[in-house]
Regions:
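Alpha-helical residues within the helix-turn-helix
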Residues: 44, 55, 61-62
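Intrinsic low-complexity/disordered segments
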Residues: 47, 52-53, 85, 104
Length: 109
């Protein structure tokens, strides 16, 4: 996903709007790439079904926030640092722009 415009930023916020997906990202962020977690481990830690975890991972993966790597017969997931940093920069940039607009409006009054 390319986070260069407002529609992409809105899509990112939509992906992050689900509490389970945020919990998944936090769990995965605590891991290092070699210590990625499989669906079963994530489901156990979150107390949700493997099916629910798989669906949420699919959304996170399609947004580019998570990567999967096959290890044996399981896929282990980890944070995609590059995309996460890009998304963070885009959000920060958008928020700074909003601050400048707000400052300009308050000066006009």
């Amino acid at each position: 996903m390319d986070y260069e415009n407002i529609d992409d930023e809105a899509a990112l916020f939509g992906v992050l709007a689900d509490p389970t997906r945020l919990k998944l990202l936090r769990l995965l962020a605590q891991q290092r790439e070699p210590n990625a977690l499989c669906v079963n481990a994530l489901a156990c830690r979150l107390g949700v079904t493997q099916s629910a975890v798989s669906q949420h991972l699919r959304v996170l993966k399609s947004a580019g926030l998570v990567k999967g790597e096959r290890r044996g017969y399981r896929i282990h997931y980890f944070i995609n640092q590059e995309t996460l940093m890009q998304a963070q920069q885009q959000i920060s940039s958008a928020l700074r722009l909003e601050e400048r607009i707000s400052d300009g409006n308050s000066q006009e009054k």
